[in-house]
């Protein structure tokens, strides 16, 4: 029997990526921060912008925000000849010289350029699917790489980033549409233009979500700085609330757990305020 009682529903979107940076070299080991930003985090903002009556709580992990900041700083320094881009995949997109064919570095970039959903991303674009098919051959028979040029890899890198591009960006960006129509033989100017789009999307994430919050459409919240499980820092026994039979250390709490938990929250607020220019409404 249907009930007349209305149940409030809160849609909470949790935007989280762990730290992918090698602390020794500051190099990014995986590209998921900037790829999910140009795809999912951007599209989510666009859907909310297009539907003024929609409401949502959006939570950002501080380590994600810090990595977006790092990408922006590195790209800006690279533009001015004052530094390198610390993500091998993004750096290769605009590299003047790509690795020599047949080398492990060349094959490594091929591998990275295939890390995408086959049906929803790769096969959606005939040009990308064709490049991916050739790439599979070169992966299985590396000795054949000597017969191809760096043009193959530069086109594959461009299509990898085009494939990951958010749908709303694809529909609105003349640059993205032009590159898709061109399809192959991408020039250095094409690759730099694509990097410009990526930079613009990354730099726009903070202002867009801040504006949505100011309009009252979004409540912005933040997680502990490193996404730490604060109850466990304070009381290891809290784990038994979800897993009664779990084996736990003899200690009742993590060393300096309360102080560490307080630092996690304070550092989270600091990063959030720096990125969005406002304090979080929830934590």
Regions found by a protein language model. Give the residues of each.
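Catalytic cores of glycan-processing enzymes that make or break glycosidic bonds
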Residues: 2-282
């Amino acid at each position: 029997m249907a009930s007349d009682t209305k149940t409030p529903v809160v849609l909470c979107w949790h935007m989280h990526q762990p730290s992918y940076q090698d602390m020794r070299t500051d190099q990014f080991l995986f590209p998921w921060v900037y790829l999910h930003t140009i795809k999912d985090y951007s599209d989510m903002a666009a859907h909310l912008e297009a539907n003024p009556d929609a409401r949502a709580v959006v939570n950002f992990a501080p380590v994600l925000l810090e990595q977006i900041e790092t990408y922006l700083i590195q790209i800006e320094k690279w533009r001015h000849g004052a530094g390198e881009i610390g993500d091998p995949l993004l750096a290769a997109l605009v590299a003047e010289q790509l690795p020599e064919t047949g080398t492990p570095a060349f094959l490594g970039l091929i591998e990275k350029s295939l890390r995408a959903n086959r049906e929803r991303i790769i096969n959606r674009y005939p040009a990308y699917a064709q490049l991916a098919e050739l790439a599979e051959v070169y992966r299985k028979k590396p000795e054949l790489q000597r017969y191809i040029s760096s043009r193959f890899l530069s086109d594959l890198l461009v299509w990898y980033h085009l494939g990951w591009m958010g749908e709303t960006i694809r529909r609105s960006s003349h640059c993205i549409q032009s590159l898709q129509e061109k399809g192959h033989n991408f020039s250095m100017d094409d690759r730099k233009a694509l990097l410009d789009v990526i930079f613009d999307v990354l730099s726009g994430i903070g202002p867009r979500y801040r504006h949505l919050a100011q309009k009252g459409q979004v409540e912005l919240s933040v997680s502990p700085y490193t996404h730490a499980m604060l109850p466990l820092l304070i009381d290891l026994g809290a784990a038994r609330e979800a897993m009664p039979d779990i084996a736990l250390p003899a200690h009742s709490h993590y060393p300096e757990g309360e102080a560490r938990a307080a630092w996690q929250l304070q550092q989270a607020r600091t990063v959030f305020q720096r990125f969005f220019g406002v304090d979080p409404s929830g934590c």
